[in-house]
Amino acid sequence: MFRVQRLRMFSTSRALYAGQNMTEKIVQRHAVGLPEGKTVVSGDYVSIKPAHCMSHDNSWPVALKFMGLGASTIKNPRQVVNTLDHDVQNKSEKNLTKYKNIENFAKKHGIDFYPAGRGIGHQIMIEEGYAFPLTMTVASDSHSNTYGGIGALGTPIVRTDAAAIWATGQTWWQIPPVAQVELKGELPAGISGKDIIVALCGVFNQDQVLNHAIEFTGDSLDKIPIDYRLTIANMTTEWGALSGLFPVDNVLLDFYRNRLTKVGNNHPRINEARINELQAKSDSLQADPDAKYAKKLIIDLSTLTHYVSGPNSVKISSTVDDLSKQDIKVNKAYLVSCTNSRLSDLESAANVVCPSGDINQVHKVAEGVEFYIAAASSEVEAEARATGAWQKLLNAGCLPLPAGCGPCIGLGTGLLEEGQVGISATNRNFKGRMGSKDALAYLASPSVVAASAILGKIGSPAEVLGTKDPNFTGVVATVEDAPATSADGKDVADESGASGSVEILEGFPSEISGELVLCDADNINTDGIYPGKYTYQDDVPKETMAKVCMENYDPDFQTKANPGDILISGFNFGTGSSREQAATAILAKGIKLVVSGSFGNIFFRNSINNALLTLEIPALINMLRDRYKDAPKELTRRTGWFLKWDVSQAKVYVTEGSVNGPIVLEQKVGELGKNLQEIIVKGGLESWVKSQL
């Protein structure tokens, strides 16, 4: 049972409250080419030079793109990290050749390289100090959010971005709206970080944090260990966020002091001097008391119990007690992945299978159930062997796999087969991700996964241990939204970081305008924009791309939309695959700007990387929907409203009848700096990189 209370925050202009949140402060440190005195804020487009950039099995495709750009040297080899972690069980000649190519490339260019078996890239980034508090660290992987668990701003990038960083040391980022998530109350005994994030995904399941950066706060933080924080940050990806940032506090500083005892003081990135420096500057890089947030979500941890996500969706969360009553039989269980395969996770599962502590007295995995385990890294596995946790799990009948991603990504041994049910401590349970699309996948904490493997059905550790879970009456949670515009459509958004006037690069327009053409639907995917049957045809001419643009969404789009129009659509526009043609087909149609309530993140990055401009204006799509709520349904509609984006003032004006007609909406948007303008003028990120070589 969930009880969510919705409140409205008192809206004020940031001209009065000028503080930065933690996300903005970290971006400020890594932004390059800012105008003098510029303070970055949510919405701004900035060029960034991240501290580190990790790629894994996709390092070879990135390398091919890098070489295809004409690049021959890595700008800063110390910035780049290559790991092999996804398909480590695959010993085919093709995969081994790819792995060897990555290793040889790394050696040639002096890149830090970690071979198959060393562990999952995200875990290595934390163990080896590449991801470090108060820095920005990116990776060509969607679970880069994980780094937020140790106070680093981690966010995913696409392969073109990675190649750009390899070649030039930098790429671009638009600072997202930032949501504050307050964790209050004391977490009941036995309830874990996985239960927290699964509950958050289930309680706030209406895209409240889609494409937001998240900052965690609250009086509960001093009792939430780093392993829990890493799990929570990791699954902010599934929650829809672009980052999930925890503060630097005594819990984190103690974590690094303990880490120092393991790596020694001569480690290049984790050493006493760096930890002391972190402690000294941590206060100045915490969120200011008057920091601005797009919204605030509050959850009372004292009201949580064991939660299970699914089947086949992270937006569906149930208590383990409710599912236990349904007697859902389990065929496979998994304790693997960057989400929950650290030492504390393995020990949590071991405590369920071996509550007495006697390694020879264990609860056995139920007959007919396969329980797979893999440590997050070789270091974690060694520690688990030393503590006895690994042997307890093996004695219970668990099946070990090498440190790596494996079943989580649907690779290697132990995948779900047709009709089977799996329960996993991983992060995604999308249909077909862990095997057959006709299987059911649930997500849960390590202790619940272990208990379910023993019981042969989804169940609680209390059922195995003969104990009783705390009384549960429902999660208490609250949402506080800050309006982006006032009732009359006037902007009340943040202007404290505005420089007053954005300098315009020669060749870039100071204004962009056109009639709004409405494609009134949410979740228009990349196949709707550019049909999949053309995706792998490399010789499709521009004229054909223009003709098939939006074909699968609405065949009439071709006759209703004209070159020079501005396309506007609903929320999560461009969800789906990573095909770049979804952006280039819109450009081929002669449309230079797309406006939506929100974008799929990969489409958003592919758009800018290919010189297609985008703006998120939720208020505008809501106004248009209200305008046409009683009109006959049209998939594509010419609105008679015109949008003018004054790039120099970072404002948009929506008018009726013509560009000079009466204003129906005026709103501040993020500043598009000269560095980003240059990418557009050059024709996209790849062309910009070539110009820098």
Curated annotation (Swiss-Prot):
<dbReference type="GO" id="GO:0004409">
    <property type="term" value="F:homoaconitate hydratase activity"/>
</dbReference>
<feature type="binding site">
    <location>
        <position position="408"/>
    </location>
    <ligand>
        <name>[4Fe-4S] cluster</name>
    </ligand>
</feature>
<dbReference type="InterPro" id="IPR036008">
    <property type="entry name" value="Aconitase_4Fe-4S_dom"/>
</dbReference>
<keyword id="KW-0411">Iron-sulfur</keyword>
<keyword id="KW-0457">Lysine biosynthesis</keyword>
<dbReference type="InterPro" id="IPR015931">
    <property type="entry name" value="Acnase/IPM_dHydase_lsu_aba_1/3"/>
</dbReference>
<dbReference type="Pfam" id="PF00330">
    <property type="entry name" value="Aconitase"/>
</dbReference>
<keyword id="KW-0479">Metal-binding</keyword>
<dbReference type="InterPro" id="IPR001030">
    <property type="entry name" value="Acoase/IPM_deHydtase_lsu_aba"/>
</dbReference>
<keyword id="KW-0496">Mitochondrion</keyword>
<dbReference type="Pfam" id="PF00694">
    <property type="entry name" value="Aconitase_C"/>
</dbReference>
<dbReference type="InterPro" id="IPR004418">
    <property type="entry name" value="Homoaconitase_mito"/>
</dbReference>
<keyword id="KW-0809">Transit peptide</keyword>
<keyword id="KW-0456">Lyase</keyword>
<dbReference type="InterPro" id="IPR015928">
    <property type="entry name" value="Aconitase/3IPM_dehydase_swvl"/>
</dbReference>
<dbReference type="GO" id="GO:0019878">
    <property type="term" value="P:lysine biosynthetic process via aminoadipic acid"/>
</dbReference>
<comment type="function">
    <text>Catalyzes the reversible hydration of cis-homoaconitate to (2R,3S)-homoisocitrate, a step in the alpha-aminoadipate pathway for lysine biosynthesis.</text>
</comment>
<keyword id="KW-0408">Iron</keyword>
<dbReference type="InterPro" id="IPR039386">
    <property type="entry name" value="Homoaconitase_swivel"/>
</dbReference>
<comment type="pathway">
    <text>Amino-acid biosynthesis; L-lysine biosynthesis via AAA pathway; L-alpha-aminoadipate from 2-oxoglutarate: step 3/5.</text>
</comment>
<dbReference type="GO" id="GO:0005739">
    <property type="term" value="C:mitochondrion"/>
</dbReference>
<comment type="similarity">
    <text>Belongs to the aconitase/IPM isomerase family.</text>
</comment>
<protein>
    <recommendedName>
        <fullName>Homoaconitase, mitochondrial</fullName>
        <ecNumber>4.2.1.36</ecNumber>
    </recommendedName>
</protein>
<feature type="binding site">
    <location>
        <position position="405"/>
    </location>
    <ligand>
        <name>[4Fe-4S] cluster</name>
    </ligand>
</feature>
<dbReference type="InterPro" id="IPR000573">
    <property type="entry name" value="AconitaseA/IPMdHydase_ssu_swvl"/>
</dbReference>
<dbReference type="InterPro" id="IPR050067">
    <property type="entry name" value="IPM_dehydratase_rel_enz"/>
</dbReference>
<dbReference type="GO" id="GO:0051539">
    <property type="term" value="F:4 iron, 4 sulfur cluster binding"/>
</dbReference>
<keyword id="KW-0028">Amino-acid biosynthesis</keyword>
<feature type="binding site">
    <location>
        <position position="338"/>
    </location>
    <ligand>
        <name>[4Fe-4S] cluster</name>
    </ligand>
</feature>
<feature type="transit peptide" description="Mitochondrion">
    <location>
        <begin position="1"/>
        <end position="17"/>
    </location>
</feature>
<dbReference type="GO" id="GO:0046872">
    <property type="term" value="F:metal ion binding"/>
</dbReference>
<dbReference type="InterPro" id="IPR018136">
    <property type="entry name" value="Aconitase_4Fe-4S_BS"/>
</dbReference>
